[in-house]
Curated annotation (Swiss-Prot):
The lineage of its organism: Bacteria, Bacillati, Bacillota, Bacilli, Bacillales. GO terms for biological process: tricarboxylic acid cycle. It catalyses: (S)-malate + a quinone = a quinol + oxaloacetate. The keyword Oxidoreductase applies. This is Probable malate:quinone oxidoreductase. HAMAP family: MQO (MF_00212). GO terms for molecular function: 2-hydroxyglutarate dehydrogenase activity; L-malate dehydrogenase (quinone) activity. Its EC number is 1.1.5.4. Disulfide bonds: none annotated. The keyword Glycoprotein does not apply. It comes from Halalkalibacterium halodurans (strain ATCC BAA-125 / DSM 18197 / FERM 7344 / JCM 9153 / C-125). Belongs to the MQO family. NCBIfam families: mal_quin_oxido (TIGR01320), PRK05257.1-1 (NF003603), PRK05257.1-3 (NF003604), PRK05257.1-4 (NF003605), PRK05257.2-1 (NF003606), PRK05257.2-4 (NF003608), PRK05257.3-1 (NF003610), PRK05257.3-2 (NF003611). Its cofactor is FAD.
Amino acid sequence: MSSIQNKTDVILIGAGIMSATLGSLLKELKPEWEIKVFEKLANAGEESSNEWNNAGTGHAALCELNYTAEKSDGTIDISKAVKINEQFQISRQFWAYLVSQNLISNPQDFIMPIPHMSLVQGEDNVAYLKKRFKALSNIPLFEGMEFSNDPEKLKEWIPLVMEGRTSNEPIAATKIDSGTDVNFGALTRMLFEHLKEQNVEVHYKHSVKDIKRTSDGSWSVKVQEIESGTIEYHTANFVFIGGGGGSLPLLQKTGIPESKNIGGFPVSGLFMVCNNPEVVEQHHAKVYGKAKVGAPPMSVPHLDTRYIDNKKSLLFGPFAGFSPKFLKTGSNFDLIGSVKPYNVFTMLAAGAKEMSLTKYLIQQVMLSKEKRMAELREFMPNAKSEDWDIVVAGQRVQVIKDTEAGGKGTLQFGTEVVSSADGSIAALLGASPGASTAVHVMLEVLEKCFPHHMLEWQPKIKEMIPSYGVSLAENRELFQEIHQSTAEALGLSEKELVHS
């Protein structure tokens, strides 16, 4: 096995939406920098970013009830929903910029307008949804949202969901037309085509084996060319680890202090996909329910219209599964291999704390198809087993860390950037809301890792993302202006526009 040595400015590990976004930002901000990407699979966007491996929801907290918790005094905390919506607006602005500059084209291949709806049953849940609707109605980001507890109105909105419903239990929904379905796999592939045109070297079938700091403070990345077995060493002043579930083991190899006391717990996802085109045509919305009491946030059930390969699809889920792999293409030894002397107590503490999650996962793994159909029928009473197939979605590695609020071994359900003190290396860990907030998260990487460049870069960032540094929730006119311009650039329908 021969060994090859190379030097570059930036190395991105993993050809998913995060590396694609960071690479695209850097090429606009520092076009002269040399960037190399290493991906162990044969194409971009094949793991978590792949359209079959995530829900494809443009997460803007329009319908996801886990972002609007009810406080002990009965009021609704909307702060998380506002934050996530603001972050999605940043993604929309950057995508619209790329389209307007002809850096990517055919936005309809990756983003489509689709109503986002929340659906609840039972008196308490209906009261909660009404309070949530009132709280969000005062915020520009959620303008255009409608609430109804009238079954006749709901039949107009979601005929499949209402058909065959015999219960007299109260039912209510909210609907907002400014929701989107995003094909993150298609977007990732587009961005990598754009990066190749910008002279970024993208190396597929290259597996990163080790990351070590050199004597001059840069990073040496050991890469194996999978087919030939050739070992290469590439050095760079900045390395980003965006390998989805594979990021934690690579972060551990760096040895940076920030990588200690962090663990990961893999959760796999299953969806049911409708194989009957007549049924698919009768539904046109992403309808999110409420997680059952005691179930984790990632278990929120939803019945989704999706656009995949320019074809309308209908999916229901997620159902959780368990695999010790950190990636769909990973190893059964990933989980045990990630347990180190410096994080073993963090992992054990999480195991003791999260017995309810363990119980939930065991129950989910044991579900038969008919039991899954029973859950679907809570949403869609007339669903027929023969119309639905099971699809295995992606692996997600939930972060486990020690926190002040939660103590040792606290399970985190968000997305987290871990970077070295000097900003020379950063990794992205975690899951939801993930890809929808990719641009915000990669700007966070830039702020953490290139603070000395931010003043110089600010005008260009503002050109690409006009709301950068400004709260759209507090600036109605700016939000309406940006929402309209991004809708036009991205080819979203007139219905999607927010009107004053």
